[in-house]
Regions:
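Short alpha-helix
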Residues: 49-75
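N-terminal accessory regions of S-adenosyl-L-methionine
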Residues: 34-38, 44, 90-93
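A structural signal for short, well-ordered beta-strand segments and their strand-loop junctions
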Residues: 9-12, 72-77
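Conserved helix-to-beta-strand junction in the class I
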Residues: 1-4, 68
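Ligand-binding pocket scaffold of soluble enzyme catalytic domains
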Residues: 1, 10, 116, 120
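Active-site rim elements
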Residues: 46-52, 108-111
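A C-terminal cap/extension of S-adenosyl-L-methionine-dependent methyltransferases
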Residues: 74-127
Length: 127
């Protein structure tokens, strides 16, 4: 709840990053218990409140927010490539890490890349 013109931050876990890194990267889709949680055609993970956490795609978030009187200010991939190369990032020296951060901030709102992020931040202003 916020007043008119207030800013709302909503955080989400991304479907695609989980599919790539865990379901494929760790082979989890070969296990029946994980197969049962994933649509075999769309690869959309089941997102039921009974699950540990819910995974979202942008269309899910848009549908969820469509009923509220808000204007989107930013749709941001908060970790983008970082989770895919966590050890590499941890081992960067200060100079390379600074360049990496500049790269991250240059791409974190690109609509063609946000869906690959493990975590997404949606920022709205209440109308």
């Amino acid at each position: 709840m916020t007043k008119k013109d207030g800013v709302i931050f909503a955080a989400y876990c991304g479907n695609e990053a989980t599919m790539v890194q865990y379901c494929f990267g760790r082979g989890m889709l070969k296990e029946q218990r994980y197969k049962d949680l994933v649509d075999p055609v769309t690869f959309k993970a089941s997102s039921d409140p009974a699950e540990l956490f819910q995974l979202y795609r942008k269309e899910d978030i848009d549908r969820l927010m469509s009923i509220f009187p808000v204007t989107r200010l930013h749709y941001v991939g908060t970790d983008m490539a970082t989770n895919y190369m966590r050890q590499t990032v941890d081992e960067m020296d200060d100079e390379l890490f600074d360049l990496y951060l500049r790269y991250h901030f240059a791409i974190c709102e690109r609509s063609d890349l946000v869906g690959a992020s493990h975590h997404i931040l949606d920022i709205f202003r209440k109308d």
